[in-house]
């Protein structure tokens, strides 16, 4: 599995270390078992998922129970509704994590999957304490050194064709 990017280090993420057998397995925003990754034998549980909460219409239905709403812009949008229904308070920490999911899946509310319900979910998360200014800056304005270097390489290779109607960028990875 890929490491968790540093831009998400404000979240309290615990990576499964394989030291226990989960009693209940919930997959969120995972449309198929092939997307589980390979970290610490997580594939051992991929075929034993009790519940999947997802917003992808392409969800393969691999879990014993599946909640899929392909009208939702993000699984985090669904969780914003579900968590209070389970009697759990939307704390500022939870709200920040869910806002991150909604904002990233919608391109900061610019993509066509963004609906009025998406904005209502974001409003609930803001009311619960998500620091939108800080989160949006971190998610969409800050760039890692590696990303800046990649952008530099891309721009250095930029060429225009057909009276500047077509632009070509070439990036190679070693």
Predicted regions and their residues:
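Residue-level preference for short coil/turn positions at secondary-structure junctions
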Residues: 20-22, 46-47, 63, 163
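A short secondary-structure junction signal
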Residues: 37-39, 62-64, 113-114, 135-137
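Hydrophobic helix-and-loop "lid/oligomerization" segment in the mid-to-C-terminal part
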Residues: 1-7, 21-22, 104-174
């Amino acid at each position: 599995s890929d490491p968790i990017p540093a831009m998400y280090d404000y979240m309290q993420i615990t990576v499964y270390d394989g030291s226990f057998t989960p009693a209940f397995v919930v997959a969120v925003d995972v449309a198929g078992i092939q997307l589980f990754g390979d970290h610490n034998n997580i594939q051992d549980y991929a075929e034993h998922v009790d519940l999947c909460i997802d917003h992808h219409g392409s969800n393969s239905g691999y879990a014993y129970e599946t909640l899929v709403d392909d009208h939702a812009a993000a699984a985090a949008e669904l969780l914003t509704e579900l968590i209070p229904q389970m009697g759990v308070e939307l704390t500022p920490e939870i709200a920040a994590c869910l806002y991150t999911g909604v904002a990233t899946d919608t391109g900061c509310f610019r993509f066509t999957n963004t609906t009025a319900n998406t904005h209502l979910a974001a409003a609930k998360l803001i009311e619960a304490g998500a620091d939108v200014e800080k989160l949006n800056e971190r998610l969409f304005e800050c760039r890692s050194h590696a990303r800046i270097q990649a952008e530099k390489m891309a721009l250095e290779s930029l060429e225009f064709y057909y009276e500047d109607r077509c632009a070509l960028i070439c990036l190679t990875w070693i």
